[in-house]
Amino acid sequence: MFLQSQKLWTMLLILAIWSPISHSLHFDLHSGRTKCIAEDIKSNSMTVGKYNIDNPHEGQALPQTHKISVKVTSNSGNNYHHAEQVDSGQFAFSAVEAGDYMACFTAVDHKPEVSLSIDFEWKTGVQSKSWANVAKKSQVEVMEFEVKSLLDTVNSIHEEMYYLRDREEEMQDLNRSTNTKMAWLSVLSFFVCIGVAGMQFLHLKTFFEKKKVI
């Protein structure tokens, strides 16, 4: 059991190291429509996002039909970003609560309908810290930058392991609760079946007695 648990945590650690923690998306959005994108974020994690509408006529200003409203909310409904009638923007915040965060894009209503092409990049954790912007040319500063990046990566993996462990404990509690409820339901179903069978037996007995069969 211990070896299996150790192997499980090793696999989770490898996945945490290699799994992507940023999303770069390109999608189309029609006039008057809304598209939402979810991201599972740990509490106290930094997250940044930026978005823009592709310009179909490069070098010219975007028409008024090419505007969107953007809203980023937590699973409990708290608002972290809200922009109206924009063609580009960005957001950054530290997640207060763990869970799914939703970024919803709504295109302005227009007739005839137009299609907007939107680029959206969402980074969480280590990748949200733009270390490349603070890296310098000197060898010492480059080494310091690499060490800080590695420390951030290690801390992120450490936090991810604790987060996964907490999620695993929550799932185990849910499974135990579900099994208990299923056991009670099985017992209740058994007594219901016994009761129905008894009622049928009494009904048949009364019926046959009236018919003088027994």
Swiss-Prot record:
The modification Omega-N-methylated arginine is found at residue 167. PROSITE patterns: GOLD. Pfam families: EMP24_GP25L (PF01105). The chain crosses the membrane at residues 182-202. Residues 25-181 are lumenal. Its main location: endoplasmic reticulum. Residues 1-24 form the signal peptide. It is found in: Endoplasmic reticulum membrane; Golgi apparatus, cis-Golgi network membrane; Golgi apparatus, Golgi stack membrane. The keyword ATP-binding does not apply. A motif (COPII vesicle coat-binding) lies at residues 207-208. Residues 203-214 are cytoplasmic. Keywords: Coiled coil, Endoplasmic reticulum, ER-Golgi transport, Glycoprotein, Golgi apparatus, Membrane, Methylation, Protein transport, Signal, Transmembrane, Transmembrane helix, Transport. GO terms for biological process: protein transport; vesicle-mediated transport. Belongs to the EMP24/GP25L family. The lumenal coiled-coil domain is required for the Golgi subcellular location. Involved in vesicular protein trafficking. Mainly functions in the early secretory pathway. Thought to act as cargo receptor at the lumenal side for incorporation of secretory cargo molecules into transport vesicles and to be involved in vesicle coat formation at the cytoplasmic side. Probably oligomerizes with other members of the EMP24/GP25L family. Associates with the COPI vesicle coat (coatomer). Associates with the COPII vesicle coat (coatomer). This is Transmembrane emp24 domain-containing protein p24delta10. It comes from Arabidopsis thaliana. The lineage of its organism: Eukaryota, Viridiplantae, Streptophyta, Embryophyta, Tracheophyta.
